[in-house]
């Protein structure tokens, strides 16, 4: 019994000694040992986790043009590629796209002249290698026939403008407005407008508009065919138009066939005559020689 008590005492002493050593660990001899306090009051050693490995900066991917580039595609195309990936059992969508490109090789060569191999890759002894400098075409960038290699494709015209040199887009080759029977403004005289060339209306304050300031701009139309003259005014010197207001009005009334009011509206000479009379005061005191015949 005594031996058992002695053995238990020695064991307790050893445990106390061990806890004493663990309570004050030497960081130089045991850098990985730490103390953690538990609810029962005992201190237990805990090992620290190893530091995570740093990721290598070495790029293991093949350097080609367009690597890591996002490609936008319509929703229908993306859904179809995803469906083919599941149906063909491929691991990724990129493998499915590669499968599609391999099947479409003849059409690609026919359209572009090159295959699915990257443009910068060069086959050396059966292996593809990336050159450090861009390839230079022989004969100054020309092929065997001497013509420049055309790599651009014809695209549909998405512009809102039309090329004026393209004859298929213009129906009028002269550059003028087409002659059509259009009714611009108000037809005062009820004249058939078939075959007339429309003119833009002129605003107020121009020399071509007759009438008072309260009237709107008028529209003139010139017939394109040889018909009866619309304004039958004989060829006379300019000075004779401003000789007498009554004579000019009478001549315009007789030449118009009874339609006095419309002819007065189109009379430019009478309007200029009256302006000169207002500026000169009276016909006798006017310094100008507008009354001379």
Swiss-Prot record:
Pfam families for the chain: TCP
Annotated spans, Disordered: 45-67
Residue stretches making up the TCP domain: 57-111
Gene Ontology BP terms: regulation of defense response; regulation of DNA-templated transcription
Biased composition (Basic and acidic residues): 56-67
A GO term for molecular function: transcription cis-regulatory region binding
S-S pairs: none
Keywords in alphabetical order: DNA-binding, Nucleus, Transcription, Transcription regulation
Primary location class: nucleus
One GO location term (cellular component): nucleus
Protein location: Nucleus
Record flagged with keyword Transcription: yes
Protein name: Transcription factor TCP19
Originating organism: Arabidopsis thaliana
Gene behind the chain: TCP19
């Amino acid at each position: 019994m005594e031996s058992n008590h002695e053995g238990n005492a020695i064991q307790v002493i050893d445990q106390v000694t061990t806890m004493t050593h663990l309570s004050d660990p030497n960081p130089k001899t045991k850098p990985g040992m730490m103390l953690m306090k538990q609810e029962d009051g005992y201190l237990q050693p805990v090992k620290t986790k190893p530091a995570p490995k740093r990721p290598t900066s070495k790029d293991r991917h093949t350097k080609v043009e367009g690597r890591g580039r996002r490609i936008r595609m319509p929703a229908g195309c993306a859904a179809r590629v995803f469906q083919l990936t599941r149906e063909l059992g491929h691991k990724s969508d990129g493998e499915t796209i590669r499968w599609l490109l391999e099947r479409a090789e003849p059409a690609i060569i026919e359209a572009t002249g090159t295959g699915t191999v990257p443009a910068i890759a060069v086959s050396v002894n059966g292996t593809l290698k990336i050159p450090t400098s861009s390839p230079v075409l022989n004969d100054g960038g020309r092929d065997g026939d001497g013509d420049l290699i055309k790599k651009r494709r014809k695209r549909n015209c998405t512009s809102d403008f039309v090329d004026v040199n393209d004859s298929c887009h213009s129906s009028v080759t002269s550059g003028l407005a087409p002659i059509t029977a259009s009714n611009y403004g108000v037809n005062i005289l009820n004249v058939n407008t078939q075959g007339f060339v429309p003119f833009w209306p002129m605003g107020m304050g121009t020399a071509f508009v007759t009438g008072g300031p309260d009237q709107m701009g008028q529209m003139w139309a010139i017939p394109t065919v040889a018909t009866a003259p619309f304004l039958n005014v004989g060829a006379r010197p300019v000075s004779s138009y401003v000789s007498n207001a009554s004579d000019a009005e009478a001549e315009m009334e007789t030449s118009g066939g009874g339609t006095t009011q419309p002819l007065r509206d189109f009379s430019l000479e009478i309007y200029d005559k009256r302006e000169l009379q207002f500026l000169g005061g009276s016909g006798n005191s006017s310094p100008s020689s507008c009354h001379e015949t």
